[in-house]
Amino acid sequence: MAEFVEADNAEAIIARIETKSRKIESLLKQYKHVEALKTALEGSPPKTRDERCKSANWIVVHRALMAIKDIDGMLNALDVEYYDILMKYLYRGLSTGDRPTCDQCLKIHEKLTERAGLGCILRCLTDTINTV
């Protein structure tokens, strides 16, 4: 069974996310959108059940996702190791029902699926332990 982060560690996780958020804002201001997305995806708290942590990290990832204009360029620059976690966040974005977010997530989903294949989708949907 996977180890889950206890609620008392949630404050430490949120503090790390806040630090990460400031770094992402700086990268976005420098038009380093891919670096911002990588930073947002790194250290995502998938093993916590604390919704505050998940929501805080989603906000950071969402900000970076919405800044991406060149999806092919982003995927060329993004390491393969990021594909599965990115797919999870795309589904989280689609679940919001927000039109601009869904549009962006669908565009990225299409290109990511072309690049990573259906296995990426299957791993994302069947992994019920590491959730975003």
Curated annotation (Swiss-Prot):
InterPro entries: ARPC5, ARPC5_sf. Pfam families: P16-Arc. It comes from the Eukaryota. One of its GO terms (biological process) is trichome morphogenesis. One of its GO terms (cellular component) is cell projection. Transmembrane segments: none annotated. Disruption phenotype: Distorted trichomes and altered epidermal cell types. Keywords: Acetylation, Actin-binding, Cell projection, Cytoplasm, Cytoskeleton. The modification N-acetylalanine is found at A2. It is found in: Cytoplasm, Cytoskeleton; Cell projection. Expressed at low levels in all tissues with a relatively highest expression in inflorescences. Its main location: cytoplasm. GO terms for molecular function: actin binding. Belongs to the ARPC5 family. Functions as a component of the Arp2/3 complex which is involved in regulation of actin polymerization and together with an activating nucleation-promoting factor (NPF) mediates the formation of branched actin networks. Arp2/3 complex plays a critical role in the control of cell morphogenesis via the modulation of cell polarity development. Component of the Arp2/3 complex composed of ARP2, ARP3, ARPC1/p41-ARC, ARPC2/p34-ARC, ARPC3/p21-ARC, ARPC4/p20-ARC and ARPC5/p16-ARC. This is Actin-related protein 2/3 complex subunit 5A. It comes from Arabidopsis thaliana.
